[in-house]
Amino acid sequence: MTTTDPHYATYIAGLPKVLAGAACLFRDAEGRVLLVEPNYREGWALPGGTVESEAGEGPRQGARRETLEEIGLDIAPGRLLAVDWVRGAGRPPIVAYLYDGGVLTPEQLAAIRLQEEELLSWKLVTRDDLPVHLLGRLAGRVRAALDVLESGAGTVELEDGKPVA
């Protein structure tokens, strides 16, 4: 079957759907994690969002674009820390890519400008306080990414925020 085959569109439409999301894990010099507070759901999040794959965007590009949109910083994502297969109720699964955003300087932190249409506030949170702010699987993803940074290990594969054995 080729892309010019009349049945190709039907074939593609029948394939399983998967969404993609991408975020950056930013820290300060003390190792605290930068979180943002969305106005459209409970809990806190990392700067990031949906990858605009239909527009040809890849996960790394999506993480950079979302960081610029949400906190006003144009920072190239560093290495890939975690990939998480996130099952959902009432939506297709999401493949969530989490990149190292690096350590922000005091000047970069002072330059943060929130996307007011989506975000209420931001704050820096210690690793121990992450479970208080992050709901469910995101907390596991962030902890796993911090472990990768601490150990120097390679990218961690997760399912629903838990390492795959």
Q: For each predicted feature, which ranges?
A:
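Acidic, metal-coordinating catalytic segment for phosphate/diphosphate chemistry
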Residues: 1-23
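Hydrophobic "anchor" residues
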Residues: 32-33
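Short loop/turn segments immediately following the C-termini of beta-strands
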Residues: 38
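A short gly/proline-enriched turn/hairpin at secondary-structure junctions
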Residues: 45-49
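Unchanged
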Residues: 51-76, 84-138, 164
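Charged phosphate-binding loop/patch that engages nucleotide di/tri-phosphates or the phosphate backbone
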Residues: 144-165
